[in-house]
Amino acid sequence: TRKKRCPYTKYQTLELEKEFLFNMYLTRDRRYEVARILNLTERQVKIWFQNRRMKMKKMS
């Protein structure tokens, strides 16, 4: 069964954006850290970064 879709909090988005500015690609260890700090799954973090990179590609 699928988990209900829930938007990221302002805080989570801000932290993910900060991390993205610092580095567009995460190592496995860093992804684990970010997920733990923001109380998200590693999969959510991974996919957020994928989507963010695509958004950047589209904007350029």
Swiss-Prot record:
One of its GO terms (molecular function) is DNA binding. One of its GO terms (cellular component) is nucleus. The lineage of its organism: Eukaryota, Metazoa, Chordata, Craniata, Vertebrata. Sequence-specific transcription factor which is part of a developmental regulatory system that provides cells with specific positional identities on the anterior-posterior axis. It comes from the Eukaryota. InterPro entries: HD (IPR001356), HD_metazoa (IPR020479), Homeobox_CS (IPR017970), Homeodomain-like_sf (IPR009057), HXA10/ABDB-like (IPR046333). Its main location: nucleus. It comes from Gallus gallus (Chicken). This is Homeobox protein Hox-D9. Belongs to the Abd-B homeobox family. SMART domains: HOX (SM00389). It is found in: Nucleus. Residues 1-60 bind DNA.
